[in-house]
Amino acid sequence: RLGHGKPKCLVDFGGVSVLAHIMSLLKDVPDVRVVVGFMETAVIAELQRVRPDAIVVRNPSFRTTTTLHSYALGAQHLAGDCLFMDADLLIVPETFQAFLDGCRPGEARLALTASKTKDAVYAEMAGQAVTGFRREDPTAFEWSNISWLPVRYFEDIGMTAVYEHLRRYLPMASGEVVSFEIDTAEDLAQAKDNARLFGLTAT
């Protein structure tokens, strides 16, 4: 939908790719796995440049599967909990770290951000718990596509969106991050307007 003819993780912000930004946020995470599909050679080249020890997981069926399948592929052979996130996000580092600091073993947790994305998944809340998702009638917060989840959640999946799959596990705890998805041209423009927030440093 962005229409740049390349993966959104390779979009450049002042000499820093979105993928490089995400890898900088994960610098203290020892086991990082990146699921690749569209233009995988270019994505792998950038990944090797910025995080050479990351594990590459191929999704050759990316044209006929959903992000949910990529999550399941990335979670294979893991046990316990895992941080799942999309690779088209720009995130204020301090808020991301605060979310990580609040994650606990065995406790599913969703990262929410103030609603701003053109095609958002809005969170329905009861206190700090996410009780539902919807695409219409905006709420104050949208799901940021960042989650701390047990890998067993992805042992049995269908052909659906991630948020639809996660509905069966609600309610879930939540934490707030400041993040910008770059799914559309409007989203990209909004992220560029806020680029100063992300601590981007070219490498």
Language-model segment annotations:
Residues 1-43:
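N-terminal glycine-rich phosphate-binding loop and ensuing alpha1 helix
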Residues 44-50, 194:
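Short, aromatic/basic amphipathic alpha-helical patches
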Residues 12, 90, 148, 181-182:
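Short aromatic/basic micro-patch
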Residues 51-125:
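Conserved beta-loop-beta/alpha segment of the NTase-like Rossmann-fold superfamily
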Residues 151-154, 163-203:
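Terminal amphipathic alpha-helical/low-complexity segments used for targeting or macromolecular assembly
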Residues 9, 31, 53-55, 171:
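Conserved beta-strand segments of alpha/beta enzyme cores
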Residues 92-166, 171-175:
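Conserved core of the sugar-phosphate nucleotidyltransferase
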